[in-house]
Amino acid sequence: MSFDVTTTEPWATLSERYTAMKATTLRDLFASNPNRAQELSFEAAGLHVDLSKNLIDAETVAAFTALAKASGMREKIKAMFDGEHINNTEDRAVLHTALRLAVDAELNVDGQDVAADVHEVLGRMRDFATSLRNGSWRGYSNHTIKTIVNIGIGGSDLGPAMATKALRTYATAGINAKFVSNVDPADMHAVLDELDPESTLFVVASKTFTTQETLANAHAAKRWLVAAAGGDESAVAKHFVAVSTNAEKVAEFGIDTKNMFGFWNWVGGRYSVDSAIGLSLMSVIGPMDFMRFLDGFRAMDEHFRTADFESNIPVLMGMLNVFYNDFFGAETHAVLPYSQDLGRFPAYLQQLTMESNGKSVRHDGSAVTTNTGEIYWGEPGTNGQHAFFQLIHQGTKLIPADFIGFARPKEDLPTASGEGSMHDLLMSNFFAQTKVLAFGKTAEEIAAEGVSPELVAHKVMPGNRPTTTIMAEELTPFALGALIALYEHIVFVEGVIWDINSFDQWGVELGKQQANDLAPAVAGEVAVDSGDSSTDALISWYRSHRG
């Protein structure tokens, strides 16, 4: 049975709050409540989250919590954590939260001791990562491993690539990580051209070991390695490991199945960075820091599972997104980390959020009655300020934005004078942007500065641009885990309100099937007959210019 949120009383209340918020400004909201920042700031899992620069007030937050309760949010959170099959289209549990269970936790799902299974794989990952880091794992020529190349796509790439970059200062064992995902041969060439096969190890990440792009890249890497080893196929077992559940295909490739690390069908790819998919990350930062990474996830899980909705950060942020998406008509959401090391975080969130909530039917197959799925995008600050912030400040579109910053840098440099801190300069920009977006600058204020009348309108900053500020003390493994889990749970909250399945991705599957169907024609092996004239003409043009 479907849940139509638009028929509920809290939805009607939220519509009234939208009308009220449209008629006010953030300047007015702050002026009327000196305690606003304190009342709308929250702490959980080492994160400080300030929601005060959003277009909400106490009555709006009350409507959020009422709507969450009306949707059965608490019961649905419990169902996910308990391993019920909430992914109804694939009849699966959704248990990424189990990947970070404590070692003494108990969770049995579908007759399996999930906690024990998770920690068995983690133990094997620790042993493998330790062997790379202490030099006991040797390649075909007895060299130690200096570079680990992760070959995967989607969730098998974006998560570990993002996290490895984010935690680069924790790479203490001299092991470098590179990532290949695109079936475009330029991706593999660019990586292999820099590497020494004797000291390179490949992690092939594919649950089924049949993913088209991943297998194409894996075989290219295998040919490169075997050629360097003088044609010795046995070298493969010393330079390849797999993250997969298909032992037969893994062995057929030449990988020793003792070096195959599994995960489960209750883990979606975009939720898998803290599973065996994180093997490359663990190898780079070490098992201890990887466990701290999991601790951060678990701390946010516990907050989400137990906190009252009035102070539950993922619930409030998820409801904010619904509010902006369905009432204000905001179609996009900017994520702006003021941390170069978090530069891949917006791309990671694109898959997490858009693959999860880019749906147009509800659980029962009926059409949704709301807008769903914001478009996520962003770049690190301050780069974004000199690229697209102009549109956020003075454009005609409302673009809610999340600003992410840290109190202490892992590394710092002096400013141009040699006396100040570049990190302080970075954060000065961070605070200035959220201030200007919220409060802007009026025509009267600009005119009072002596600006010529013909320029006043051009310089007006409307303000009232909503932002959420997320801060942590440092970008640590714990903080990154908590940050990822925060957004995972935001996705869940939105999915509950919209009554969509956030854990399937049929739109991705059809594209894969069509690509396989068209491949023979694209390769010139069969006549072009795709079923539509446009695709036929495009493939024919491609073939005629391919040479």
From Swiss-Prot:
Keywords annotated in UniProt: Cytoplasm, Gluconeogenesis, Glycolysis, Isomerase
GO MF assignments: carbohydrate derivative binding; glucose-6-phosphate isomerase activity; monosaccharide binding
The reaction(s) this protein catalyses: alpha-D-glucose 6-phosphate = beta-D-fructose 6-phosphate
Annotated localization: Cytoplasm
EC number(s) given by UniProt: 5.3.1.9
One GO process term, biological-process aspect: gluconeogenesis
Superkingdom in the source lineage: Bacteria
A GO term from the CC aspect: cytosol
Catalytic residues in the record: E355, H386, K512
Keyword Membrane: no
Pathway noted in the entry: Carbohydrate biosynthesis; gluconeogenesis; Carbohydrate degradation; glycolysis; D-glyceraldehyde 3-phosphate and glycerone phosphate from D-glucose: step 2/4
Main subcellular location of this protein, as a coarse class: cytoplasm
Family membership: Belongs to the GPI family.
PANTHER family: GLUCOSE-6-PHOSPHATE ISOMERASE
UniProt function note: Catalyzes the reversible isomerization of glucose-6-phosphate to fructose-6-phosphate.
HAMAP family: G6P_isomerase
Entry protein name: Glucose-6-phosphate isomerase
Origin species: Corynebacterium diphtheriae (strain ATCC 700971 / NCTC 13129 / Biotype gravis)
Gene: pgi
